[in-house]
Curated annotation (Swiss-Prot):
Lineage per the UniProt record: Bacteria, Pseudomonadati, Pseudomonadota, Betaproteobacteria, Burkholderiales
Record has Metal-binding as a keyword: yes
Top-level taxon in the UniProt lineage: Bacteria
Annotated positions binding Fe cation 2: 125, 128, 162, 165
SUPFAM superfamilies, per the entry: RmlC-like cupins
Note on cofactor: Binds 2 Fe(2+) ions per subunit.
Name of this protein: 3-hydroxyanthranilate 3,4-dioxygenase
Organism: Paraburkholderia phytofirmans (strain DSM 17436 / LMG 22146 / PsJN)
Residues annotated to bind O2: 47
């Protein structure tokens, strides 16, 4: 028998998991214990963090539209992902996926991180652009590892205060 089971209809899988592809969960991993982290992410979803992935990320915008805010050389840039678009993000490019459309669906594929290779999550000051806070994690599960990290940032005014200008990051997007 195959390790990961038989082929299945992916569109049906998405429809069957649609209730998990919207807030508050927003995403679902297709396979567990694979060399790849294959995640389906639904909208709407607004993030204030920037992910520093040590490896490449593949995006396939299946339904609706989305965009990535990129933090490059101290400036925010935007990459639009229209329905049907694919995009390969290089390692260590800080990115913040934004999915404003309800019902939008994106397939995101990442490699499992080798032991000792960590992901970073960063928040930048809206007033001056400096790094406000960074947390690193040995990522095992996107679904379960991230909420505690994000909630710790949202709950702490100290973590959200910019050390450069004193502005307090608003935390979670509304």
């Amino acid at each position: 028998m195959l390790t990961y089971g038989k082929p299945f209809n992916f569109q049906r899988w998405i429809d069957d998991h649609a209730h998990l592809l919207k807030p508050p969960v927003g995403n679902q991993q297709v396979w567990q214990d694979s060399d790849f982290i294959v995640t389906v992410v639904g909208g709407p979803n607004h993030r204030t963090d920037y992910h520093d992935d040590p490896l490449e990320e593949f995006f396939y915008q299946l339904r609706g539209n989305a965009y990535l805010h990129l933090w490059i050389d101290g400036k925010r840039e935007r990459v639009d992902l229209k329905e049907g678009d694919v995009f390969l993000l290089p390692p260590h490019v800080r990115h913040s996926p934004q999915r404003p459309e309800a019902g939008s669906v994106c397939l995101v594929i990442e490699r499992q991180r080798p032991a000792g290779v960590v992901d970073g999550f960063e928040w930048y000051c809206d007033a001056c652009g400096h790094l406000v806070y960074r947390v690193e994690v040995q990522l095992k599960s996107i679904v379960s590892d991230l909420p505690p990290l994000f909630n710790a940032f949202y709950a702490s005014e100290e973590k959200r205060r910019c050390g450069h200008c004193g502005h307090v990051h608003p935390g979670k997007a509304v």
